[in-house]
Amino acid sequence: MLHASAAALGGRAYLFSGPCGRGKSTHTHLWQQTFGEAVQVFNDDKPALRRLDGRWYAYGTPWCGKDGINLNQKWPLGGICFLEKSQENRIRRLPAAEALPLILAQTTYRLPPQYMELLLASLDSLLREIPVFLLENRPEEAAARLSFETMRRAAEEEGL
């Protein structure tokens, strides 16, 4: 599971992650405002990630945070985006070495030592196959458009 808010649009899931207070729920609400009913927010705190038949999927879980958004849905994963507040909207793709510590910090990883190797192997696969971004943003519709268009384009280029 990843500490994130998960939204589906255009047949793919996109996850917004970061520490508490970074605007994960705010950003998925902006997606709803910007793209309307085409967006499905299916988990607002801890979606599950799983690789199945050569493809990564995001799942809604009962662990859904204060807003209670926890739909029992599965979507192909199109991208993960870490959020930072900023005065300008900018997005960039993160190399795996930069993305790994961010993902580890937001992963439910209180595991016995013998399972850490499995977690790290899964994260290695995830980072090789799924584009990860950093979005510096203001809470506005322009940031929602920037994040979606950038991640959608990357997902299409990667064949996701």
Predicted regions: what they are:
Residues 3-5, 9-19, 33-160:
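Glycine-rich, often acidic-flanked micro-motifs
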Residues 22-23:
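Conserved glycine(s) of the Walker
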